[in-house]
């Protein structure tokens, strides 16, 4: 017996949903002038006014997960990661949502982590689960490999103020984080910290003269009265290095010295005598 049950299609109907209760924690970025905030909620990109105006859903892509949104420093673009193709790819779109999104990467083969804009708004750097650190030029869409780790994913990457250097963290076989600097000009990386201590979170000073990082190198143990053991509970401190030989450390040792005054009134003249003066002295000597 053939049986059919008619329904009113309630499950497939559109409905209004309060997306504010589905904002993804930690996935937000403030516009460079502070007037709008961008977030991801229910897999879509949104921008929210700081005080007055409308909330915009920029993507409206059911079935697609968009995340890791970042506002370009010049305020023009939003960069984000989307699985619209079935794999994680990086896109940019204008912050007003008027223009169509632009796909920057292709052939995605693994999970991508957060993207970070260069200060000149021309490049994006990110790391992935295949232990790669890469950046892409948003104009040419050229992807460049910065570093290939062997044991663990890279820590967060940060740009220098002139967009010519990238500071990043990598763990090697000892699983101890180390801070490196990558030059976009030479395509080479330089180890900044040593192999003895855990270090991470390299960040440039606004003037580009210093690199700050967090390192576990403060060994001040606390002795337990019950466990008969030592606890190293507060090893992490903030440190910095100067990035040029000509840069003086603001914490360089100082040594006050006494300024010795020189008495110039009794100083003997060393000015050569003229020929006339020499003849006069010669005549005085002959007369005596």
Sequence positions of predicted segments:
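Hydrophobic beta-strand positions that form the internal "hydrophobic ladder"
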Residues: 37, 75-78, 121-124, 163-166, ...
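Multi-bladed beta-propeller domains
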Residues: 1-23, 49-67, 82, 93-113, ...
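Short consensus segments that form the blades of beta-propeller domains
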Residues: 35-37, 81-83, 123-124, 169-171, ...
